[in-house]
């Protein structure tokens, strides 16, 4: 009997392969789709807004999808819009451009531009521009964490970290990019696997760029970095290590931070189940949001 080959996929590849299909909207959930946050207009620089009807001055969640920085879409939000709007928050889902068409720092600038649009226009849709939470899954987790720690991105669009009430990166594996590059290289070597054609090094660039695109490298005291809740899959070695690496840097800098390892789930399900009643990670997330809004 010939043994079946074992296929090893990265976190980002799994997310891209299993991207969620958009679901029909419930009757009580409204959405304003395909709003351009940059010029000239293109589909990768647009966002969707889910506003609770008839409300004003509500806190806002800006959600950044995953997909390995090469795939994914703002429509892949599963239960999140309904869950957040029912909790009294405006939910915004953003698209961004992909590598290799643009560089990784350009993608981070896209996220900052989307936040700028939210800051300038969300009051018209019931939101409070001074109470924004930046969240994301997988590749989106790296982007959310980077923009929430490296203040150059928001400063470039005329904003500061002060508008962020919190950051929730979900199961990211690149808060410390050089660490992940070394981890993956060692694992490939031990398993006798070939180098990928377009892996982390191709996406992030040489070591100096990898360091500069790592959220951990920008954590420092007195920068106004918002509180963090770092969600991860408890059984995933890489994302657990990265979550604790980021948590350690934040705590060392005096930034309120917490990790939560979700048991009995995986990378895709953790994202998909956020917003589902009874989901432990969802409970942690809403507890975090509630506490952050009291400060």
Predicted regions and their residues:
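Catalytic nucleophile-loop/oxyanion-hole region of alpha/beta-hydrolase
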Residues: 36, 72-80, 92-130, 274-278
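N-terminal cap/lid segment of alpha/beta-hydrolase-fold proteins
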Residues: 20-55
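Mobile cap/lid helix-loop segments that gate and shape the active-site cleft of serine hydrolases
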Residues: 21-25, 40, 178-221
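Short beta-strand element of the alpha/beta-hydrolase
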Residues: 57-67
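C-terminal catalytic histidine-bearing segment of alpha/beta-hydrolase fold enzymes
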Residues: 48, 229-295
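A fold-wide structural signal in alpha/beta-hydrolase
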Residues: 60, 85-92, 97
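Primarily recognizes the serine-hydrolase "nucleophile elbow" in alpha/beta-hydrolase
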Residues: 116-183
